[in-house]
């Protein structure tokens, strides 16, 4: 059984690139795979491996300067959910492109999953999903507003264009594991919004804690590993990933004329050029050759 750990922490790294070699070496030595992002504002990522391997990496991360409060969520899987280990150096651990946003200074009020349903049922509360459009498409909370953003960096512009809709409203925000809400609630507070709340632990914590018969969540939650989606109890969902556009699809979608493994699906067929598709076919060919060599 493999452990999947989704983690993040906002802190100040003076030289994140200097942290990469030892972290990458440890992950490889422990057989841990996945992706970790290091930036001046902290660390973010998802990794998978054995219990001992994950514990070793988490201990290493918690020992980094200012990281003793590292947040992570765990789930179990019968397979490794990443092919290799990557440690990347970025400007931000979650890209918002708002240099004045700093979750270390202040964030919205945390709301536990146990209290979330009561909060979002209040008539003076506006519930905003801060995730990308393709994530919202497969699942969200009842009555939640979908900003229809293609990336988190589009959220500030959406808020600026729509903030008049929320005059005298309390704002409740949610995302997959909590990291985007750390930034979005700080951003709204900086814009003068007084009552800002966010779901502690994100959707993943809610799906783990709240029984389905008491839940206001509809659908599945997109996750950034080979599970693609999860439902209540963090059970693996039905979705697959189109490797042409990295968006979730259902098994039935593979029967559509637009689907070609590793190349396209009905969501992206008209969005890519013939040159793109040729490049994706070559990539898929190399993947299949690598699989054959691994089985030989």
Curated annotation (Swiss-Prot):
Q: What class of enzyme is it?
A: oxidoreductase
Q: Which InterPro entries match?
A: Rhodanese-like_dom, Rhodanese-like_dom_sf, TrhO, TRHO_N
EC no. given is 1.14.-.-
What's the catalysed reaction? uridine(34) in tRNA + AH2 + O2 = 5-hydroxyuridine(34) in tRNA + A + H2O
Q: Which residues form the Rhodanese domain?
A: 121-215
Described purpose of this protein according to its UniProt entry: Catalyzes oxygen-dependent 5-hydroxyuridine (ho5U) modification at position 34 in tRNAs.
Organism phylogeny: Bacteria, Pseudomonadati, Pseudomonadota, Alphaproteobacteria, Rhodobacterales
Query: PROSITE patterns under this entry?
Result: RHODANESE_3
Molecular function (GO) terms for this protein are:
oxidoreductase activity, acting on paired donors, with incorporation or reduction of molecular oxygen
Record bears the keyword Oxidoreductase: yes
Keyword entries, A-Z: Oxidoreductase, tRNA processing
> Can you supply a Gene Ontology BP term from the record?
tRNA modification
Active-site residues, record numbering mapped to chain = 175 (cysteine persulfide intermediate)
As for family, the record states: Belongs to the TrhO family.
- What PANTHER family does the annotation carry? RHODANESE-LIKE DOMAIN-CONTAINING PROTEIN 7-RELATED, THIOSULFATE SULFURTRANSFERASE/RHODANESE-LIKE DOMAIN-CONTAINING PROTEIN 2
Mind telling me what this protein is named?
tRNA uridine(34) hydroxylase
């Amino acid at each position: 059984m493999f452990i999947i750990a989704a983690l993040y922490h906002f802190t100040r790294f003076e030289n994140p690139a200097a942290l990469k070699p030892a972290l990458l070496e440890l992950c490889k030595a422990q057989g841990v795979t996945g992706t970790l992002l290091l930036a001046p504002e902290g660390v973010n990522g998802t990794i998978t491996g054995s219990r001992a391997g994950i514990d070793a990496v988490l201990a290493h991360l918690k020992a980094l300067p200012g990281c003793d409060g590292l947040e992570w969520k765990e789930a179990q899987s019968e397979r490794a959910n990443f092919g290799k280990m990557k440690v990347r150096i970025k400007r931000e651990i979650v890209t918002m492109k708002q240099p004045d946003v700093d979750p270390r200074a202040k964030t919205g009020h945390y709301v536990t999953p146990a209290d979330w349903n009561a909060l979002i049922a209040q008539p003076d509360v506006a519930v905003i999903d801060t995730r990308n459009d393709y994530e919202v498409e497969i699942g969200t909370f009842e009555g939640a507003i979908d900003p229809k953003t293609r990336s988190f960096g589009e959220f500030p512009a959406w808020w600026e264009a729509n903030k008049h809709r929320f005059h005298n409203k309390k704002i409740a925000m949610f995302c997959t594991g909590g990291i985007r809400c750390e930034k979005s609630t700080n951003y709204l507070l900086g814009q003068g919004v007084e009552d800002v709340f966010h779901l502690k632990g994100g959707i993943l914590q809610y799906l783990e804690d709240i029984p389905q018969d008491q839940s206001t969540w509809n659908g599945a939650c997109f996750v950034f590993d080979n599970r693609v989606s999860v439902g209540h109890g963090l059970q693996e969902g039905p979705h697959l990933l189109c490797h042409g556009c990295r968006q979730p699809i259902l098994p039935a979608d593979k029967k559509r004329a637009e689907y070609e493994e590793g190349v396209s699906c009905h969501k992206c067929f008209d969005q890519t050029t013939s040159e793109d598709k040729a490049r994706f076919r070559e990539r898929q060919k190399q993947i299949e050759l690598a699989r054959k060599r691994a089985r030989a």
